[in-house]
Amino acid sequence: MKKLLALLLTFALLLTSVSAVLAESEEEPAASEAPEITYSNDEITVAVTTPLTGNFFTNMWGNLSSDLDVRNLIHGYNLVEWDTEEGVFLPDNAVVSDMLIELEKSDDVKITLTLYDDLCYCDGTPITAKDYAFSLLLTMSPVIKELGGNVRTPEFLAGYKDYINGTAKALRGVKLAGDHRLMITIRSVYLPFFFQLGLLDCVPYPASVIAPGVEVADDGNGVYLKNAKDLTADTLKETLLDEASGYRTHPEVTSGPYKLVSYEDGKAEFEINPYYKGDTHGNKPTIKKITMICKTSDELAAALKDGSVTILNKVTGTEAIAAGLQLTEEQETLTSVSYDRTGLSFISFNTDRVPLDDLGVRQAIAYLADRDSMAEEVLGEYGVRAGGYYGLGQWMYLLLSGKVTPEEPDEDASAAEKAAYKTKMEKLGKLDLEEIEPYNRDVEKAVKLLEKAGWKLNENGEAFDPEKDTVRYKKTKDGLKALQLTLAYPEGSAASKALEETLVKSLAEGGIELKVEAIPTDELFPQYYRQEKVKYDMYFLGTNFEVVYDPSLYFTETKDGHHQWKTNGLVDDEMWQLTVDMRKTEPGDLAGYCDKWLQYQERIAEQVPVLPIYSNTYYDFYPEALEGYEIAANISWPQAIVSAYFEE
């Protein structure tokens, strides 16, 4: 079963070489006329299409894919790693020398991790168990919330609630035993957990840099911060958030294969971390310097052609992909790979704002939005309208869509193994993605929903006439209210035309006036994550889901004990419970997990806190001479680049 999950996740990341036979005009120069570009291990430049915003510390202030790439490049020595062959999380063999799992009398599970004593930050400072404990304690500190960040809520840790509520001085679920031994206790109520050791996902952070004067201590009852009075919002504003030197944007002491040496004007520069001992497979980086920049889709092919960029990562859009493929046809020195996205682009409704607090209005928008045309305009043949809140590359979709079939047992397998396989296939066969409401475009259905919700008048208070009226109105205690909505999307998005023209026009057919505005990402995401005041009714953005897919983390508990989706305001205990049921699936029970995942997708479609727009295929373009760039065995280019090199 573990092997099957590994197969599915590897398939989701699988990169297949692509080629295209494209017509060439007589005026086009022959490939031999192109200037010769020399590549070396001295330096490369990677171009991405999502701007870097400087969230290089954690995802607490945002989680754009480009910022995540930087974090994967400079923060290393995670306690665990995803093993693509076994399909499970395992201790990172470069970090953990020994692991012991014990069942306690309370049925809690204690995991003792012994760390190697040769781990260092990029400045040579030793890394100990205290650095991991500090990472946990800092990211769950209420001071983070004062600074506009999303506080981590590791509810799986024993003693979490007592510690976070201030009724306990120490976090008893994390203990120290010397400099290189860490004991983590998982609450029994949080088990089973489908991704098992994925709960131990943790990288070290230097307390001496982020919180000078603060130390991690353990008097036998669990870890706590000594001199915690020094961990104030004012202190962290300087050490974390200072625009010129704060650890959030300029982390100088880090643990990954590369260290950040410069970040300015949206461009980041990295050099090899000389103290990096290597990953679990012994890989150490060869390429000395990396520059990471953001370019618009129409700039990508030219930059690769003239050699100013070495790798184009996650290219989307019909024109950009076509230009890249044509370039690989013209120049044999260049190649490309494609892989299905493990996420999607979507519209997030702020369901606690009028009129989107009305389910009927959200459903009406779903029926009105011409998502097929939007996907076609933006992606052409390289994407499709999203069928739910998932990506084409997620293993759950691949399994239920039949794109991946579980491997049959060997002929010499036992009768029990064959029976288990048959049962599993029967369970999977009963699951159907078509159970998710597709919201195929239907103006008539949308109009009925709007009228039922009271939006049936015109600006004069008379019955709305679609032949002559444009905007619907509703009678409220404050008078007539127009059905006018606002939507913000990131500047430079390839979907700008689809949003400003196609979406606006399709909603107008139902009597909804939509005003669309492009805003900088450093304005959009703080609003989306509700770190700043929400100014729009809807946000258009994209996401790629992590390997540890635990949507229960999307929710927070309200003061009256209900559960609210943090980014869109939807209060839905049933949806939250479905996410809890998902994570508590027994490890290896793929059919059981997919069953709960499908119910979760159906609930999202029913309540419409988000409207899935499209998912797509990504393309990477890079020199043929770049050896070892094995994306299929990795999750992102920073992980693949560690083993990549140019033969010299």
Regions found by a protein language model. Give the residues of each.
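Gly/Pro-rich hinge or "lid" segments in bacterial periplasmic/extracellular proteins
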Residues: 190, 198-285, 289, 443-452
